[in-house]
Every structure is written in C-alpha cells, then in structure tokens.
Regions:
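Phosphoinositide-binding peripheral membrane targeting modules
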Residues: 42-82
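Alpha-helical transmembrane spans
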Residues: 1-29, 149-150
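Generic structural motif
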Residues: 38, 45, 61, 67, ...
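Short N-terminal helix-initiation segments at or just after the protein's N-terminus
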Residues: 4-5, 9, 41-52, 108-111, ...
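Terminal and domain-flanking low-complexity segments
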Residues: 3, 95-150
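Conserved beta-hairpin
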Residues: 21-57
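Hydrophobic alpha-helical transmembrane segments and immediately flanking/interface helices
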Residues: 72-104
Length: 150
C-alpha cells in the first residue's frame, strides 16, 4: 500500500473510532431529573458514574413548555417564551417526541433547559414550579403576584 493510501485508511479508522466514542458517550448517557430544595437538578449517569451537571433555582424559572414541532407550535412557543439566548439539552434521546423546556432567566439571559420527563415527574414539576413561582412573586410584590408579569 502506498503512503497516501495508508494515511487515508488511518484517518478513516480514526474517524470511525471518534464517531463510535461520541455516539456511546452521548447516546448511552442517562439523565435523571430531580426537584430538590427548590432547585431543578439534572444528574447524568454514564456507566457507573453519576454526575450532577445542572442545578438551577426554580425562582429563576419563567415557564415549562412542551417543545414545538410544527410551524404553528413554534410560533406559539416564540410568543410565550420570547428570544431564547442559550439552550442546554438534557434529553435521553437524540430526537425526543416529548421534550419539554424549562425556560429561565440565567444571569439576565433567557435560557432553555431541555429535558424529557415522564408524566409523573412532569406533573410534580409543574405543581412545585407553580408554588415556588407564586411564593416568589409574593416576595417581590407583597401580594398574590397579580401585579407582576408572570
């Protein structure tokens, strides 16, 4: 084999190895979502290693929204959430059908945390978030939060 062919063959094998590594690294990760002490926490499990990779206060939250798929849904999403500056994807699959976004204000930037909850977690998250949001607005405005833009 000529030297050029050997280099091409080596690059091909290196590319295949890198692709396999990235595929295993990101698609074999399992995400666990928790509500803990008023925070939304995301844990990533890769093999036997469990790492906390995200923890944000529910007080910074703006909305929990199902991710849009159609053009009409995308327009409605833009109306509700506005211009999102940052996005962090904590979904278990590459193209999730039932992904949700926890939209929050992070250091003055509107940010999305994408996650793929089961129905039970989603229901609990929505209830806890609504309570935390209501209490936070009471702290800010000293009433039931009706005077703020929720």
């Amino acid at each position: 084999m000529k030297l050029k062919e050997q280099k091409k063959f080596g690059i091909l094998w290196l590319s295949i190895g890198a692709a396999l590594f990235l595929f295993c690294r990101y698609t074999l990760s399992v995400y666990t979502y928790l509500i803990e002490d008023g925070n939304f926490v995301v844990l990533r499990t890769l093999g036997k290693k469990i790492s906390p990779i995200c923890s944000v206060s529910l007080k910074t939250g703006i909305a929990i929204v199902k991710m849009p798929h159609t053009a009409a849904e995308k327009e409605e999403y833009r109306k509700k959430c506005g211009n999102v500056r940052s996005r962090f994807n904590y979904c278990r699959t590459l193209s999730p059908e039932n992904a949700y976004a926890f939209v929050l204000d992070f250091n003055g930037r509107k940010t999305e945390l994408l996650f793929e909850p089961n129905e039970e977690f989603l229901h609990s998250f929505e209830m806890v978030f609504a309570n935390v949001r209501r209490e936070y607005l009471r702290e800010l405005y000293g009433d039931d939060g009706e005077s703020g833009d929720a």
